[in-house]
Amino acid sequence: MDAQAKKKAMFRSKLNAKKKDTRIDSPLVRYNESDQPVCRVCNVVLKSESLWDVHQASRKHHEAIDSLKASAAGVQRGSKPAETRPTKIEALAKSSNSQTSSGLPPNFFENREPARAEVEPAKSKNLEQSKHTIGSETNKSKGPLPAGFFDNQKTDSSNTKTTSEPKQSQTQTTGPETKPMVNGNLPTGFFDNKEADLLAHGIKLVKPDIKDEYKEFEKLIQDDLQVVDSRMEEEEVDAAETIEEEEQREQRSYKEKVEILKRKKMELKAARLAKRSKTSEGSVKKPKKTEEESPSDEEDDEDSAVDWRAQHL
């Protein structure tokens, strides 16, 4: 296990050294937490350093550079619109004043309540004047009428006041501030549209920002890529280990075969030497027999010669 851990560490150190050698030295590139190159202009994560040249030649990169240049030029021109804004506001104020002068008088709606307050004391003055006139007429026409006949006039006037007051209250309520009142709470899901339902319950909708969602999506992709890279590294390490083990096994099998062949060769050499020794021993024994048989052959030759002479005779 220690040897395997050392091998893995060596393999990873080699990979890290290769990555360091291929780093991009450019002011437009930065590296994130996972040692991936990121374009500072486009804020795009590159999968590898070899794609930097392709990204520089891309249309998106050039458009981002042009937008940065345009924004820098807009910052320099930002002081001019600030100076022109007050003139627009003054023009709007003049137009509103002209409308009020042509149609309704200025502060028409603001002075509406004091006008109502002036109407009420005028009405009270008219009532008092009517009382005085009625009293004078009664004083003139006093005679057979009983005393205190006109004392009930106060109650009549009070009744008239009470009847006039609710009318005034009604006119006040039917002013420009009349709004429909909703009694009770609506149940959830009353509206088919979710936005309208939430607004009816007083819940403000938060519109999702596309940029934030895109950044979250990029983070998820980066996390997935990190997981994939780690798995690839582990698989490469495991594959390297398995390849080394297979090579070692093949070498062992080849060594065993070589040893077996050497043994067979030695056995064959020994067998050949044994055969040669046997054949050499047999050849040594045969010449002795020939030497022993040679005098008998000479005798046979002499006998045959004697027989030949005898035949001629």
UniProtKB/Swiss-Prot annotation:
UniProt-recorded Gene Ontology molecular function terms: nucleic acid binding; zinc ion binding
Cellular location(s): Nucleus; Cytoplasm
Tagged with keyword rRNA-binding: no
Span of the annotated motif Nuclear localization signal 2: 274-281
Compositionally biased residues, Polar residues: 155-176
Pfam families registered for this protein in UniProt: zf-met (PF12874)
Domain of life from the UniProt record: Eukaryota
Coiled-coil parts of chain: 232-271
Assigned keywords, A-Z: Coiled coil, Cytoplasm, Metal-binding, Nucleus, Repressor, Stress response, Transcription, Transcription regulation, Zinc, Zinc-finger
Induction, per UniProt: Slightly induced by abscisic acid (ABA).
Motif (Nuclear localization signal 1): 5-12
Record keyword Ligase present: no
Major localization class: nucleus
Reported tissue expression: Mostly expressed in siliques and, to a lower extent, in roots. Barely deteclable in leaves and stems.
One BP term from GO: negative regulation of reactive oxygen species biosynthetic process
Annotated Acidic residues bias: 232-248, 293-305
Consequence of gene disruption: Hypersensitivity to abscisic acid (ABA) during seed germination and to methyl viologen (MV) at the seedling stage, associated with a reduced expression of the superoxide dismutase CSD3 and an enhanced accumulation of reactive oxygen species (ROS) after ABA treatment.
Annotated zinc fingers (C2H2-type), start-end: 39-61
Region entry Disordered, spans: 115-189, 232-254, 271-313
GO cellular component: cytosol; nucleus; spliceosomal complex
Feature: compositional bias, Basic and acidic residues: 115-131
Function, in words: Essential for breaking seed dormancy before seed germination. Prevents reactive oxygen species (ROS) accumulation in response to abscisic acid (ABA) and oxidative stress, probably by repressing the accumulation of ABA-induced ROS-scavenging enzymes (e.g. CSD3).
Name by which UniProt lists this protein: Protein ABA AND ROS SENSITIVE 1
Native source organism of the sequence: Arabidopsis thaliana
GN (gene name): ARS1
